[in-house]
Amino acid sequence: MAKVSSIQKNKSRQKKSQSLHNKRSELKSKIYDKSLSLEQRFPLIIALAQLPRNSSSTRIRNRCELTGRPRGVIRKFGISRNKLRELIGRGLVPGVVKASW
């Protein structure tokens, strides 16, 4: 089980990223617009740099919903490989069966 503080930190990053997503994407699209001069784009670059670091989507860690484990998370289920194997073994994941041949 991961530390509660690290799980909460990741959740706050997700909220901050969602709330500032539109503003961040607008600034980025204007910054990469080559029809604007550098003098026009420079204030936009500064405005983007002044946004909180945790509002960037790259700072969000993909964590297991059950345990908070940061590694080995299967995206389709949002669960770590260990817990997924355990749940599949019990038959709690519909439509997934253990392979045997």
Swiss-Prot record:
Residues 10-22 have a biased composition (Basic residues). GO terms for cellular component: cytoplasm; small ribosomal subunit. Keywords: Ribonucleoprotein, Ribosomal protein, RNA-binding, rRNA-binding. Binds 16S rRNA, required for the assembly of 30S particles and may also be responsible for determining the conformation of the 16S rRNA at the A site. The keyword RNA-binding applies. PANTHER family: 30S RIBOSOMAL PROTEIN S14 (PTHR19836), SMALL RIBOSOMAL SUBUNIT PROTEIN US14M (PTHR19836:SF19). Belongs to the universal ribosomal protein uS14 family. InterPro entries: Ribosomal_uS14, Ribosomal_uS14_bac/plastid, Ribosomal_uS14_CS. Part of the 30S ribosomal subunit. Contacts proteins S3 and S10. It comes from the Bacteria. GO terms for molecular function: rRNA binding; structural constituent of ribosome. The keyword Transmembrane does not apply. Signal peptide: none annotated. Residues 1-26 are annotated as: Disordered. GO terms for biological process: translation. This is Small ribosomal subunit protein uS14.
